[in-house]
UniProtKB/Swiss-Prot annotation:
Entry similarity comment: Belongs to the universal ribosomal protein uS17 family.
Keyword Transit peptide tagged: no
GO biological process terms on file: translation
Keyword Ribosomal protein recorded: yes
Keywords tagged on the record: Ribonucleoprotein, Ribosomal protein, RNA-binding, rRNA-binding
Assembly mode: Part of the 30S ribosomal subunit.
Name of the featured protein: Small ribosomal subunit protein uS17
Entries under HAMAP family matching the protein: Ribosomal_uS17_A (MF_01345_A)
GO MF annotation terms: rRNA binding; structural constituent of ribosome
Amino acid sequence: MVSKGKTVKDPGIPNITIPEKVCEDEDCPYHGSLRVRGITLEGVIVKYRGTKAAVIERQYLYYDSKYKRYERRRSRIHAHVPPCINVREGDKVIIGECRPLSKSISFVVLGKVS
């Protein structure tokens, strides 16, 4: 549990503002003990479940060398949403890789892109 006098951690990701709201979530990169390591990605929330989990979709271009053209692809990533970050479906967010939190969740939402 987080005590009231404990300082807020800064994960060191550029262009991320630390949330003003304080949460008691142990899987929060700001107020808990979750460490962010690995890659950081940017995507749009397409589904937000009430169980502190969201589905983030990112679209990217893939070069097909046979036809010498680019094709659009998408990937859907499941991510944990801490209670101190207010997001809704359609918001553009930055997610960071962390340890596996469940069978399909290995990313955490770090903040909204404004």
